[in-house]
């Protein structure tokens, strides 16, 4: 499996399609200025800006409020403490899931029974709704706009198509913001000397 195919599989829940390296080569032949933008988006400076953007999201993305479910309440202050202190090691867009699990454990203990899947989902949705958005495509588009680049087009997931120079920054953003699954199926990584994945 190529790294481009790996990236496509990892991003299929965010975008409908991703360009591959051959698409980028074709674009740069037709418009050499694209090569400069590609180099910029693959630079350490661009990654540093993306990291700074992620840090600012900790405050900008959240809309905390009390949660009440069947007589059990978790106050806004308690949620903030859990979010910023107890579960700080959990990536930002997965962190509220940990807070919700904590609350669900409290509810189950007080009610002396497990919540059904539907009840758990209802509680999870209360906590997920505290994020302004959880969509990496939207967040990356916002980042591009703040940095002076053209934002990504607003469209439904199936119609989204990432240019090659944006595929790896979005993948990086996803792995930074979400608790991603392990890839136990990957046993070896072979880097062809013709492919340069370094900065």
Predicted regions and their residues:
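Alpha-helical nucleic-acid-binding subdomain
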Residues: 1-198
């Amino acid at each position: 499996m190529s790294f481009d195919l790996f990236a496509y599989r990892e991003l299929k829940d965010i975008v409908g399609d991703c360009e591959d390296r051959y698409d980028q080569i074709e674009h740069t032949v037709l418009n050499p200025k694209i090569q400069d933008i590609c180099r910029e988006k693959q630079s350490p400076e661009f990654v540093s800006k993306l990291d700074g953007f992620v840090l600012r999201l900790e405050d900008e993305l959240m809309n905390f409020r009390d949660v009440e479910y069947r007589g059990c309440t978790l106050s806004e202050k308690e949620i903030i403490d859990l979010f910023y202190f107890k579960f700080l090691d959990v990536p930002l867009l997965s962190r509220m899931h940990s807070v919700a699990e904590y609350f669900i454990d409290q509810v189950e203990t007080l009610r002396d029974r497990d919540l059904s899947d539907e009840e758990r989902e209802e509680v999870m949705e209360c906590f997920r709704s505290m994020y302004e958005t959880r969509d990496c495509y939207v967040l990356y588009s916002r980042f591009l706009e703040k940095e002076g680049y053209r934002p990504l087009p607003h469209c439904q997931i199936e119609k989204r198509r990432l240019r090659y120079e944006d595929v790896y920054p979005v993948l990086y953003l996803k792995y930074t913001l979400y608790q991603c699954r392990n890839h136990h199926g990957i046993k070896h990584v072979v880097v062809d000397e013709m492919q340069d994945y370094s900065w």
